[in-house]
């Protein structure tokens, strides 16, 4: 599976992110605007740099600007989409089959919510996209999945309905179970569940769920 890691300009734990990249060995790395600062600090080289560069450091711009093997897309700062969205769409155009966003969380809640919204591009294109930081893994799913306890990202699994209702939600292997439940929005029912079996199943008939695996 051709994996693309996109580093964007939100909060990022350099140690975690560098280890994640080294472990995953992605076929493609993209820096979205000030995400290039992470690559510069850690002496890593992205394949692509995309953005309007309103927040990237001059040092990073100068350093990577002299490297001929990096491809650049300079965006107009007056635009309708974010640098992160442009990077995601470019990754898909380049043949990515899986996308991970690093640096997509942080103090700007508007950017975080916007980045979660962008996970839906993965559903539209049948490509899994996830947001990962040192404490969370966030995905958006339109069909059931299996979570293996030995491979889970964090102790807690939270489910948030993205559509008005997620019909027929069934949870097995969890501490708190559901059986063909119509899971509607504007409630906190799905927060902080836990896997208690070797594997847990999330199944539903219709709708879209946000799945967050979290650890303290």
Q: Where do the PLM segments sit?
A:
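General beta-strand structural signal in soluble alpha/beta enzymes
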Residues: 7, 30-33, 51, 73-74, ...
């Amino acid at each position: 599976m051709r994996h693309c890691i996109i580093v964007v300009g939100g909060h990022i734990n350099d140690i975690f992110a560098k280890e994640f990249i080294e472990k995953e060995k992605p076929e493609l790395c993209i820096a979205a605007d000030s995400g290039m600062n992470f690559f510069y600090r850690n002496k890593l080289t992205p394949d692509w740099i995309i953005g309007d560069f309103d927040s990237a450091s001059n040092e990073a711009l100068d350093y990577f600007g002299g490297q001929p093997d990096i491809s650049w897309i300079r965006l107009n700062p007056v635009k309708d989409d974010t640098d992160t969205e442009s990077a995601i769409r470019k990754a898909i155009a380049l043949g990515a089959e899986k996308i991970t966003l690093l640096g997509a969380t942080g103090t700007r809640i508007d950017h975080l919510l916007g980045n979660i919204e962008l996970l839906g591009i993965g559903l539209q294109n049948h490509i899994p996209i996830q947001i990962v930081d040192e404490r969370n893994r966030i995905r958006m799913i339109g069909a059931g999945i299996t979570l293996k306890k030995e491979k889970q990202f964090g102790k807690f699994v939270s489910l948030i309905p993205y559509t008005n209702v997620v019909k027929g939600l069934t949870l097995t292997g969890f501490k708190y179970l559901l059986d063909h439940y119509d899971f509607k929005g504007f409630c906190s029912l799905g927060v902080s569940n836990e896997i208690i079996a070797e594997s847990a199943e999330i199944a539903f008939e219709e709708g879209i769920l946000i799945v967050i695996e979290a650890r303290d």
